[in-house]
Amino acid sequence: MNTILLGNLIKIRWIAIFGQILAIFFVFYFINIQIPFFESLVIIFLSVAVNFYSYLEQRKNKTISDLKAFYFLLFDILQLGFLLFLTGGIINPFSILILAPVITSASYLPAFMTVILSAISIAIITILNFYYIPLNLGEEFYLPQIYNFGLLASLIITVIFIAIYAYL
């Protein structure tokens, strides 16, 4: 059993949900970047639903098993992956946040669970480098392929570094 409290994970997810909603509204309404607004909100509100369910679970148990914590963090990685797919892939400045569940896992969960979450994060990061809905910035905007490769490599290296460093 790990030492992480379910309530802490729920609070962190509420902060993420609030930040995601704020970012989507700001980008769509104030910066006027055309993103899949409704679809993005659907993905975010899935997190709201899961967090309400987690809150009900927390009323029964304050602590969470390693396996449930693993699934909790896996959901966060997948949810952010889908949101990044809708909003520009890894060139989205918020793509770095995909590291947060890996950091949490490395801090609290057994190594094999962190390795699995790291591998899934790396797979999602790699997929998002090639497949995503581009941001419609109004004019032609392309980053050089070498930049995309560098960003991909830096995110992958960071995931690996976090996973290894936590267990040294």
Language model segments and positions:
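Alpha-helical transmembrane segments of multipass membrane proteins
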Residues: 21-25, 52, 81-85, 103-104, ...
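Short, Lys/Arg-rich, polar N-terminal cytosolic tail immediately upstream
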Residues: 1-5
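Membrane-embedded alpha-helical segments of multi-pass membrane proteins
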Residues: 44-49, 74-78, 93-101, 149-157
